[in-house]
């Protein structure tokens, strides 16, 4: 009886061992992909990488409201708002494009307004000239505005003459420099008016006007503001250079 029970227990344990071993082999032979496979990442199912911040005012039509600024904002405030928003949403392509588009619209509107302001200013000045008295119109007909290059060249010439006179103030008077400046003034006016007599008359008038203003204003300057070697003649010549420059540059 005991022998029979021992044999049954031996057979059952052997059978159970075979079952466990077969299950272990089946688990080892199972494809590795079943164990490597896990839940998909949610970031791959969402556009633009999932957690990238998006600009909340992408669809706002007004460019000022889109950038979060007022219509009276300065150019520095516009640039600052644009840079701040781009630093926050540069990873989101649509947000960055929306911010840049609003910024470009504001710049274009500012350029158009400036252009209109310049045109309106010219129109107003022209209208005021037309509405002015006849003697004012006749006076303005003798005035013109040359290109900036011509203004700078003549300013350099007469500025050089003034510096030359100041540097030689201890040796001799500025008569030679004034004569050269007067000749240059007549030359420029003759090239403009094509009339030597008219050019000489305007140049002489500019010379007299500069001398008169210098003789009248120089004595009013406090002596402690002037260099000891600067004479009345030298200071008067500086006014003459200014008058000759204005005459040959803006008169016709």
Curated annotation (Swiss-Prot):
One of its GO terms (biological process) is protein folding. One of its GO terms (cellular component) is chloroplast thylakoid membrane. Keywords: Chaperone, Chloroplast, Membrane, Plastid, Thylakoid, Transit peptide, Transmembrane, Transmembrane helix. It is a multi-pass membrane protein. The keyword Thylakoid applies. Pfam families: CPP1-like. Residues 1-40 form a transit peptide. GO terms for molecular function: protein folding chaperone. It is found in: Plastid, Chloroplast envelope; Plastid, Chloroplast thylakoid membrane. Disruption phenotype: Reduced chloroplast biogenesis and chlorophyll synthesis associated with less POR protein accumulation. Residues 61-116 are annotated as: J-like domain required for holdase chaperone activity. The chain crosses the membrane at residues 156-176, 201-221, 231-251. Interacts with POR1 and POR2 in chloroplast. Belongs to the chaperone-like protein of POR1 protein family. Exhibits holdase chaperone activity involved in the stabilization of POR proteins against photooxidative stress in chloroplasts. Required for chloroplast development. This is Protein CHAPERONE-LIKE PROTEIN OF POR1, chloroplastic.
């Amino acid at each position: 009886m005991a022998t029979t029970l021992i044999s049954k227990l031996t057979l059952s344990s052997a059978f159970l061992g075979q079952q466990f071993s077969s299950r272990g082999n089946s688990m080892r032979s199972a494809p590795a992909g079943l164990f490597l496979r896990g839940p998909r990442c949610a970031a791959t199912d969402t556009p633009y990488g999932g957690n990238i911040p998006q600009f909340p005012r992408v669809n706002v039509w007004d460019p000022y409201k889109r950038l979060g600024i007022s219509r009276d904002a300065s150019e520095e405030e516009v640039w600052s708002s644009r840079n701040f928003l781009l630093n926050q949403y540069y990873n989101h392509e649509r947000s960055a494009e929306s911010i840049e588009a609003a910024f470009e619209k504001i710049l274009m509107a500012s350029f158009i307004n400036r252009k209109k302001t310049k045109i309106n200013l010219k129109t107003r000045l022209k209208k005021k000239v037309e509405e002015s008295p006849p003697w004012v119109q006749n006076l303005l007909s003798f005035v013109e505005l040359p290109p900036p290059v011509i203004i700078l060249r003549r300013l350099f010439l007469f500025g050089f003459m003034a510096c030359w006179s100041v540097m030689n103030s201890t040796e001799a008077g500025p008569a030679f420099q004034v004569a050269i400046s007067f000749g240059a003034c007549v030359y420029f006016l003759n090239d403009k008016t094509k009339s030597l007599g008219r050019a000489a008359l305007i140049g002489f008038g500019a010379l007299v006007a500069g001398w008169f203003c210098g003789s009248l204003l120089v004595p009013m300057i406090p002596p402690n503001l002037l260099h000891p070697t600067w004479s009345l003649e030298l200071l008067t010549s500086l006014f003459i250079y200014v008058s000759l420059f204005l005459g040959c540059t803006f008169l016709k």
